[in-house]
Amino acid sequence: MRSILVCLQLYLFTLNAQDSWNVNLVFNWHDTSLPATFAYSNVYNEIWGFEVNNYDYAVIGSTNGTHIFDVTNSDSIYERLYIPGAAQGGEIVHRDYHDYKGYLYIVCQEGASTMQILNISMLPDTAYLVYDSDSTFSQTHNIFIDTSSGIMYAGYVKTLYPSPLLMGMAVYDLADPLNPVEVYYQSTNVHDIYSRKDTVFLNSASDGLEVYDFSNPSSPVFLGSLTGYAFEGYNHSGWLFDDGKHYVMSDENHGYPMKVCNVEDLNDIEVVSHASSGVDPNSIPHNQIIMGDYLYVSYYHDGLFIFNISDPTDVKVCGYYDTYLPSDHASYRGAWGVYPFLGPDKVLLSDMQSGLYVLDVTNALNYNNIVKNYIKGIKVYPNPASGQINIDIGNNEIGPVKLKLYNVSGHLLYEKTLSNRIESLDLGHLNIKGLVFCELYSLKDIKVHRIKS
């Protein structure tokens, strides 16, 4: 019986925008009546999700406000609520969300905005605003609530009272969820924040990654930092691995890969690997969330990419879904955010031009189950390649091998039987461009290996 011996991803210049692999579309919503932003013609921004009373909900921001969808039944997804923003229109680029103790917190960075708090505890029957005011702050770029301590962290904050003040970051105690109390602020800019049990990772823009102990929120203690790393740019966002030993972060610069950092010793944070979509030399990861052994990334221009991170030193793509059809990568369009916590059949994605996506990533998660057993020593290089590839099966006794190349749509592009331990193939005449999947078949027991160079 013929079995897959090797399955790998091979990049052949030049890379193009992709369609999908191992990810299926469940639902898409886009309201053409909503205004686009003056910058980049974006209509939508952040995505969030929550479960309450056995119902699942998706939250997406737009230039006009907040849209909440009931996604409980994949066959009948619909918009359940719309919350108008205090500020609306073409100037609105950023909204952000987090839920805590039956409340959804809604913020915005532009215009005469407010913080809004929505009581969601009685859904599906009803939900209503219980707070809509600029008394705490008028604007903020984003928020993160550490639910273990009831502390809300906010980046790029503008307050109006008692006098206008711009803060790089502010921290609020949610002991009373309807009355956030400021307990700390700093002037140094922080773009994004991740906190787990009061250990707080600050993606500090041009100042790299910083880590603090906020167990006493009014007096944080510095624990460590990382600067001067390869591909350092505008440190934008990040997420901690479930085991707490590694942290993945992205710099919002064209062509810069994500960095996987070992954070077991915060006095010596080390980048142990890089990961990228590989779609274009200018691809940019925007936001990322980790659930289990999988990293979910919303990429500008490239859509959703899912990576297996079970080995932090060898991060592998296992699925993707492109939501932005144009092939340009020079701007900041396409996917904004991702939310995977409603389950593999309800992964939420927001695209700035085309709206809300509900995606089924079951195949992407199952894909890696067949990759755990593999034959070591097989090499396919160079990768990326410009036409010629070399295949070295090493010292493995596997007999004749058949090579097959497929494009992202699953169409067979090329096949050949290999009889030598090392083979060089010139594929230039095929004029293959973009992401290509290479499979090597043997006649022996199933052995599967993915190679990433």
Task: Enumerate the language-model features and the residues they cover.
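C-terminal outer-membrane/trafficking sorting elements
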Residues: 373-381, 385-453
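Selective for proline/serine-rich intrinsically disordered segments
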Residues: 1, 175-178, 218, 380-382, ...
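N-terminal regions of proteins, emphasizing targeting and processing segments when present
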Residues: 8-10, 365, 374
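Feature marking well-ordered beta-strand scaffolds used for ligand recognition
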Residues: 17-366
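Bacterial Sec-dependent N-terminal signal peptides
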Residues: 1-20, 411, 437
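Compositionally biased, intrinsically disordered low-complexity segments enriched
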Residues: 7, 11-13, 69, 118, ...
